[in-house]
Design a protein with these regions (language model features):
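Structured alpha-helical
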Residues: 13
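Lipid interaction determinants
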Residues: 2-9, 18-124
């Protein structure tokens, strides 16, 4: 009878139980100013449930959150997306993209705003 090491048995049991190892985190790429303009104009960023920010090509920002609609402005400055909602909820962000997934990262914050970049949805 062959002897198997405990580590080898544990590895096989782990793969059978949990599946193969997952690849490293998705590869996000930082967008330049021109890429931000090209990707966001006419599109929306949303969590697909509670909120959406619609980026019009003319720099108008329309936000929908929990049934409420608000307006603001957006522009690109120094390779960052800058949002002005008329309150303290604005600022400038680095934009990182991986497929349809998007992250807005603010300097000094470790928590990005995460969402999905998609064509504008029809809202009533």
């Amino acid at each position: 009878m062959k002897k198997y090491s405990i580590a080898a048995i544990a590895a096989v049991v782990g793969v059978l139980t949990f599946g193969p190892p997952v690849e490293a985190a998705e590869k996000f790429q930082k967008l330049s100013g021109s890429q931000i303009r090209a990707r966001l104009a006419g599109m929306e960023i949303t969590d697909e449930a509670h909120w959406a920010d619609v980026f019009a090509a003319n720099g108008t920002l329309t936000s929908y959150s929990m049934g409420r609609k608000n307006s603001g402005k957006w522009h690109v400055q120094n390779d960052e997306l800058c949002i002005d909602r008329g309150n303290d909820d604005g600022g400038c962000y680095q934009v990182w993209l991986s497929g349809k997934k998007i992250e807005l990262r603010r300097a000094g914050s470790s928590l990005p705003l995460e969402g999905v970049l998609q064509k504008q949805s029809v809202r009533r």
